[in-house]
Amino acid sequence: MQNEKGKNWDESRHDAVIIPKMRSKLQKPKLYRVFLFNDDYTPMDFVVFVLKNFFKKSFEEATHIMLNVHQNGVGECGIYSYEVAEMKVIQVRECAHQNEHPLQCVMEWK
């Protein structure tokens, strides 16, 4: 029997290369919680606006979180990967600054 190059093929020889099966261990990304903190100056409507626009919350969800912020001093906006959480914190801080509100937004490792 001949192979594609015309050389004799020895069927008794095993020319197969055995590649060991490697398991790649994918790690789940670390998650971060994003919080808003209450202050005496930021209007409740602005907090709802932030939650709807930057965290994609419904009006009802945003209102519920805003009331948590108002009554408890802090409210959780969501849980995200590091990059997403960091971007949301930056967006909220910039928006608050542009609108002259002292609203504080932070992220914390879960």
UniProtKB/Swiss-Prot annotation:
Pfam families on file: ClpS
Top-level taxon in the UniProt lineage: Bacteria
InterPro entries given in the database record: ClpS, ClpS_core, Ribosomal_bL12_C/ClpS-like
GO BP term (any one): protein catabolic process
General function of this protein: Involved in the modulation of the specificity of the ClpAP-mediated ATP-dependent protein degradation.
NCBIfam families documented for this protein: PRK00033.1-5
Subunit-level organization: Binds to the N-terminal domain of the chaperone ClpA.
Similarity remark: Belongs to the ClpS family.
Protein name per the record: ATP-dependent Clp protease adapter protein ClpS
Source organism (scientific name): Bartonella quintana (strain Toulouse)
